[in-house]
């Protein structure tokens, strides 16, 4: 994965790091929920999502997010439509991984990555590993 990492640093943002090799989904969801002001842990979300040693399904993450009172939906999305706090599913080689969009411009994508912390990736490289599968988590409309 180091091939496409331009920089890595932990900033002031809340980034929940994954505690197990297969818990990137719950950690990514915990990052988004905490940034939305929802108190949660990676372990709690992993249990709610049915995470096991093979990982977490997007459906499991939707169940976990809704159980915390938020709206969540899995969608297919184009790169240009990605926004802050979108949880994206990426694939490089045989590795599948959930990570969180922090910001994006015409050249770079900055991620809150549960395995690596805050990283910046060249947009061209990110476009090759981005699958188009996105989990959008939002507060319910009042």
From Swiss-Prot:
Protein name: Uncharacterized protein MTH_1463
Organism per entry: Methanothermobacter thermautotrophicus (strain ATCC 29096 / DSM 1053 / JCM 10044 / NBRC 100330 / Delta H)
Gene Ontology CC terms: membrane
GO terms (BP aspect): proteolysis
Gene3D superfamilies to which the protein is assigned, alphabetical: Cysteine proteinases
Pfam family, one: Peptidase_C39
Domain of life of the organism encoding this protein: Archaea
Keywords for the protein's UniProt record, in alphabetical order: Hydrolase, Protease, Thiol protease
Transmembrane stretches, start-end: none
GO molecular function: ATP binding; cysteine-type peptidase activity
Domain Peptidase C39: 18-137
InterPro entries: Peptidase_C39
